[in-house]
Amino acid sequence: MVTNSETDVVKVLKDDGLKDIDWATLEKYQNATTTNLDDFRDEFGRWTSWAVRIAYNDFFGGVLINQLSGKGNRKHYHPDADENWVILDGEWEWWIEGQGTKKVFQNDIIVVPKGVPHLITCVKGPGARYAITKPDVNHVYV
């Protein structure tokens, strides 16, 4: 049963526990040619939750998300786009409908097809993941 739908990435991130996120922070490094996780952690903190949008164009958006143990997102799906992640740090649990819960680690790549509910939790942090999907993707919460 659909309970909520959202395309505003700042609202999505705030509701997922990144309370200090705002548009200025999210877009500060948007479409920068080269970025580095350690540089972001020096600026925003290793032991805090934050997000920055690295890529944004007509075809895809990419958001780097740093979260602490026990943090993650709400169960949701994207009705019109697949979503991909690259794990940069930490240990995560990915629940994917029809596949159950999987543990993922640094250098793992995860793909969830459109329409498939999923839930992400950092279990050993700080954890960093790079999420890639269509720009302004619709999140439908279940």
Q: How does the language model describe each region?
A:
Residues 2-22, 59-61, 65, 119-142:
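Double-stranded beta-helix
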Residues 98-115:
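Short acidic-glycine-tyrosine-enriched beta hairpin
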Residues 47, 63-79, 114:
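Conserved short histidine dyad/triad with adjacent acidic residue
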Residues 1-60, 74-75:
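A short, N-terminal "cap"/entry segment at the start of jelly-roll beta-barrel domains
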Residues 69-71, 80-81, 100, 116-117, ...:
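A generic "binding-loop/recognition-motif" signal
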Residues 65-68, 77-94, 133-135:
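Short, conserved beta-strand element in jelly-roll/cupin
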